[in-house]
């Protein structure tokens, strides 16, 4: 039985929208950048991208490349900005030793901002995701442990978890969640194996965190693959994808022998992140189940642009019976 989406879809051209805004939270004016093609359909997905320590929303927008992925796949992007500490550095409150007296609740800020954007721009309340780099990856982990219903899946890059931080439910999350971890073996800012003595404060190793979420999601199988070294620089990325027939949740780990950065140059990590998020797109539009013989005519993305059959991208499949099938993953149509 296949699910058939009844949908009229029209998108003649793209106009891009990028603006900076303030959001009042707990008495603080918080900054963020909102980016989207202005002709996004109602109920489009929303992706948050959080900057690293000392970074900014503007810098993360330039660094991540996520706007281009949004243009190609039809989703909105929010680049939130942390608060500024007494040394003048922007940060997310994840429990660094030198922020021990800070009371800013960034978990609640991001959840509140996401809910506001969903309402204000008619974005999907079911399809909101978050990724982040370094300190931004750390706030992703905190949100994952929080088990919020606001964010559907999480993709921390080069981040970690500080057990002495601001969360009380470490290793006791409210619910299992899908998570995609990217980290370099030669990361000298957030060591892959964790560290007890860096000035950040004690933090956990990547394998400890990944194994926790694998167990939490009751995942029993995995696939391992190695990306080709396209530029012959010796930097290799290995993917390990954990899954199970008993749940839709997956846990991915992309490990590479590079340092503290957004990813290995052989892959487009922002596209990989969106591919992961696309697995968890929930379609709230009315569907009808039918079995039909059909031939594929064309494939469109969320913006109505004709699209190649890209792995794990949320697409609409038009068949000769004049109906559209939706899938977050082309494997549903194999």
Language model features: what each stretch is:
Residues 179-182, 216-283:
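C-terminal catalytic histidine-bearing segment of alpha/beta-hydrolase fold enzymes
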Residues 52-55:
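Active-site glycine-rich loops that stabilize anionic/oxyanionic intermediates
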Residues 16-46, 58-64, 72, 102, ...:
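A domain-start/cap signature at the N-terminus of enzymes
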Residues 159-221, 231, 242-245:
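The feature captures the conserved acid-bearing segment of alpha/beta-hydrolase catalytic domains
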Residues 58-107:
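Active-site machinery of serine-nucleophile hydrolases
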Residues 38, 94-134:
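Gly/Ser-rich "nucleophile elbow"/oxyanion-hole loop immediately N-terminal to the catalytic nucleophile
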Residues 325-332:
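Conserved small/polar residues in nucleotide/adenosyl-binding loops
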């Amino acid at each position: 039985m296949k699910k058939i989406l009844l949908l009229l879809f029209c998108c003649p051209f793209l106009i891009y929208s990028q603006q900076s805004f303030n959001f009042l939270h707990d008495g603080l004016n918080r900054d963020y950048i909102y980016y989207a093609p202005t002709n996004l359909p109602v109920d489009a997905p929303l992706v948050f991208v959080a900057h690293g320590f000392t970074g900014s929303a503007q810098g993360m927008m330039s660094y991540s490349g996520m706007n281009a992925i949004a243009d190609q796949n039809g989703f909105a992007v929010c680049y939130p900005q942390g608060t500024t500490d007494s040394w003048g550095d922007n940060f997310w409150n994840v429990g660094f030793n030198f922020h021990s007296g800070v009371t800013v609740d960034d978990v609640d800020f991001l959840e509140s901002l996401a809910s506001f954007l969903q309402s204000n721009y008619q974005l999907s309340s079911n399809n909101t995701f978050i990724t982040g780099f370094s300190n931004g990856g750390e706030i992703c982990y905190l949100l994952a442990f929080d088990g919020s219903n606001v964010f559907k899946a999480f993709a921390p890059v080069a981040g970690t978890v500080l057990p002495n931080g601001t969360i009380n439910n470490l290793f006791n999350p409210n619910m299992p969640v899908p998570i995609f971890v990217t980290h370099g073996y030669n990361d000298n800012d957030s060591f892959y194996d964790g560290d007890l003595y860096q000035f950040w404060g004690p933090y956990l190793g990547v394998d400890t965190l990944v194994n926790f979420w694998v167990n939490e999601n009751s995942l029993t199988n995995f696939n391992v693959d190695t990306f080709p070294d396209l530029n012959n620089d010796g930097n290799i990325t290995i993917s390990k994808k954990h899954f199970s027939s008993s749940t839709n949740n997956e846990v991915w780990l992309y490990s590479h022998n590079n340092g503290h950065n957004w990813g290995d140059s052989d892959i487009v990590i922002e596209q990989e992140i969106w591919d992961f998020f696309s697995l968890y797109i929930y379609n709230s539009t009315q569907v009808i189940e039918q079995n039909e013989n059909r031939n594929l005519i064309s494939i469109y993305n969320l913006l109505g642009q004709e699209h190649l059959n890209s792995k794990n991208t949320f697409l609409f499949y038009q068949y000769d019976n004049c109906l559209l099938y939706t899938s977050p993953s082309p494997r549903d149509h194999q």
